[in-house]
Amino acid sequence: MSIIGATRLQNDKSDTYSAGPCYAGGCSAFTPRGTCGKDWDLGEQTCASGFCTSQPLCARIKKTQVCGLRYSSKGKDPLVSAEWDSRGAPYVRCTYDADLIDTQAQVDQFVSMFGESPSLAERYCMRGVKNTAGELVSRVSSDADPAGGWCRKWYSAHRGPDQDAALGSFCIKNPGAADCKCINRASDPVYQKVKTLHAYPDQCWYVPCAADVGELKMGTQRDTPTNCPTQVCQIVFNMLDDGSVTMDDVKNTINCDFSKYVPPPPPPKPTPPTPPTPPTPPTPPTPPTPPTPRPVHNRKVMFFVAGAVLVAILISTVRW
């Protein structure tokens, strides 16, 4: 439960009672005078035509009439209590559960009863809703929620530490909210990389913190710098050159004209290495020279020839 209080003057005096006995037969001149306690003392009243002690006439708080608000979107009564304020009657201190004040009709009624209430606006406007794109945003940034216009007026008119605390609390609880990129910029690694290289105002170069972007911003972040340096873009270009960031990283988050960026020429292609020369196969050893064959004497042939000659000689001898 988130408690919020406001004070209002009660004008209704209809719910009255006597602080002590004040009717014939029930009082006397010796009846002690009563008191209204914390209730509204409307003054003295004569009792029993003056025969009894006069008594204060008191009025009770008209809780619903003084403090009543419309019910929440879920049909719950936001009123927690109604008590006489520390200043005394007829000032009434109305206490509400701010979590149950969740419609614009309730807010409008609250403002008509109590006037502007930054504390209510902080709780009401710093609630997550969806925009027409289906993204989670605060009511300040919503283009679909009926309270968008009212919350933007509060956002513009009530800069200060209390509002900053409400913005910061919303973005801590909703780190993925589309309108928290500026407040949550420290969680963006691209922001961290670029920020470490310079001290220029974030509104000058980080797109979510630019003055014309629909992002939640604290205090002086909403002021438009008059002397934004141009060197920051060269820093980013250098980071693109050395590969610290990519174009996809920075094109939507860094406020530079990237059409002026000229990427460095690609490095020359390395000369392919000369393939190694295949090794020369070893020369096979020279086979040994075969020995010269010697003539083989065929003894059988020689004996045959010799035999044939001998036979021929014998035949010729016989003829003779």
From Swiss-Prot:
Pfam families in UniProt: Pox_G9-A16
Membrane disposition: Single-pass membrane protein
Keywords noted in UniProt: Host membrane, Membrane, Transmembrane, Transmembrane helix
Amino acid composition bias (Pro residues), ranges on this chain: 262-294
Cellular-component GO terms for this entry: host cell membrane; membrane
Membrane spanning residue stretches: 301-318
Cell compartments where the protein resides: Host membrane
Entry annotated with the keyword Nucleotide-binding: no
InterPro entries: Pox_virus_G9/A16
Start and end residues of each stretch annotated as Disordered: 261-294
Major subcellular location class: host cell
Keyword Protein biosynthesis: no
The protein's name: Uncharacterized protein 002L
Taxonomic source organism: Frog virus 3 (isolate Goorha)
